[in-house]
């Protein structure tokens, strides 16, 4: 497979995505991060090769995945998402090999589904979403664009999560709950 990929953001979330992307068949060419981090290694063999100002340089060569985390506010992730799209870039959808996504589920562009997550039949996950480790998204649940469903959260059947929502670690939403717009 060996699809070329550049990660945008060099913090902890980046470290979590690297192995998932490798196993999913991506060849990571490098990481874009802050100017002061250019040349630094995020993990052995994975260097910061530039900043998000370099996105237009790579749009014809690679796909991108946003690896800036989101806990308090998704604004940085949204700005980077828009910057990639405005430059004509393509955002990869990365699903870890240990995750299970039903063939009847829908996953939006730029979304990352990490290890041991489960997305059940008829679930819909929007664009640029983080589905973190051990998350369970049950049948007919809907996750809006630009969300972060944190480690171990359980989103039960027919729940609706609006856009730009953070669901914290180990949160449990009972069936048919709506959170956010």
Predicted segments with their positions:
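Hydrophobic, well-ordered beta-alpha structural blocks that scaffold small-molecule cofactor pockets
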Residues: 1-43, 49-51, 56-57
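A general structural motif
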Residues: 2-3, 28, 59-61, 88, ...
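Short alpha-helical
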Residues: 12-13, 72-75, 106
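Alpha-helical elements of the RecA-like P-loop NTPase motor core of helicases
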Residues: 15-19, 75, 145
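Short amphipathic alpha-helical segments
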Residues: 18-20, 77-80, 125
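Phosphate-bearing ligand-interacting subdomains
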Residues: 39-100
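Structural signal for interior beta-strand "rungs" in well-ordered beta-sheet cores
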Residues: 93-181
């Amino acid at each position: 497979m060996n699809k070329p990929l550049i990660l945008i953001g060099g913090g902890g979330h980046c470290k979590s995505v690297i192995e998932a992307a490798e196993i999913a068949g991506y060849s990571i060419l490098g990481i874009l991060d802050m100017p002061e981090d250019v040349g630094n290694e995020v993990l052995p063999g994975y260097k910061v090769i530039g900043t998000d100002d370099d996105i237009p340089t790579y749009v014809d060569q690679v796909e991108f995945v946003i690896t800036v985390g989101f806990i308090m506010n998704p604004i940085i992730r949204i700005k980077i998402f828009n910057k990639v799209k405005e430059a004509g870039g393509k955002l990869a959808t990365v699903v870890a090999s240990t995750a299970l996504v039903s063939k009847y589920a829908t996953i939006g562009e730029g979304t990352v589904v990490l290890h041991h997550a489960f997305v059940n039949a008829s679930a819909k996950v929007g664009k640029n979403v983080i589905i973190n480790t051990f998350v369970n998204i049950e049948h007919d649940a809907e996750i809006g664009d630009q969300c972060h469903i944190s480690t171990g959260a359980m989103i039960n059947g027919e729940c609706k999560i609006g856009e730009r929502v953070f669901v914290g670690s180990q949160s449990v939403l009972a069936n048919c709950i709506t959170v956010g717009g």
